[in-house]
């Protein structure tokens, strides 16, 4: 999902308790379909609109750092040749492609995104990677049975989701015991003085990026759908509340981005 600037507005994350048709609905593990909520439909529509300029928008809004952040996420996943990985909120497939390179032709990468437009672009971009499959799907109802993957990743998608706690539980559910869940997400930087400078700078840059890519209206619509980002401690607590253990945090870009890794208990 697209990198969007943090905001201090809105409620914090609360820990939880223990090429297809564009009209396709998210699948369950049994192949059945489930209808989208109005919120899901709005998010999918907004991402469909920015899909043609998604990668350029990410580069501008991250000031060119998004590639190195994805590489850090791949390293943190701990995967190797022959492993199976699920990438949720996969967008146009930049992270999925990097994961596919790591697992090789005998591995598997399942890339899931709510936006048919993103899925179409991701599938086209990775068409030469036999180990990579793109599907339209809901992060809160992943199209997989339990314990099917060696790792799960989500990059810049969590804050867009209506049910973030449910999505984190799903990521944990589909990963085998001992496997890792990797979350790469914008977080409010600390110290607060840097957070205020960063927030003001990126909020000024974001409308310019939308204009430069020819999708200002679509970007503004998407940004209006996005709720607050957590600080790093809230993100860590969200992962722990899902049942993950050994949760580790690494701050990137002076804390404006957090890379969190948790392990599914044996």
Describe each PLM feature range.
Residues 63-81, 98:
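Conserved alpha-helix/loop element of class I SAM-dependent methyltransferases that forms part
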Residues 81, 105-106, 175-180:
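Short glycine-dipeptide loop
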Residues 165-177:
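A short glycine-rich, Lys/Arg-flanked "PGG" loop and its adjoining helix->strand segment in the class I
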Residues 84-141:
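Class I SAM-dependent methyltransferase SAM/SAH-binding core
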Residues 41, 184-240, 248:
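C-terminal alpha-helical "lid/dimerization" subdomain adjacent to the S-adenosyl-L-methionine
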Residues 242-266:
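Core SAM-dependent methyltransferase catalytic element
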Residues 150-164:
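A short SAM/SAH-binding and catalytic strip from SAM-dependent methyltransferases
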Residues 140-152:
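A short acidic, Gly/Pro-enriched loop at the edge of an enzyme's catalytic core
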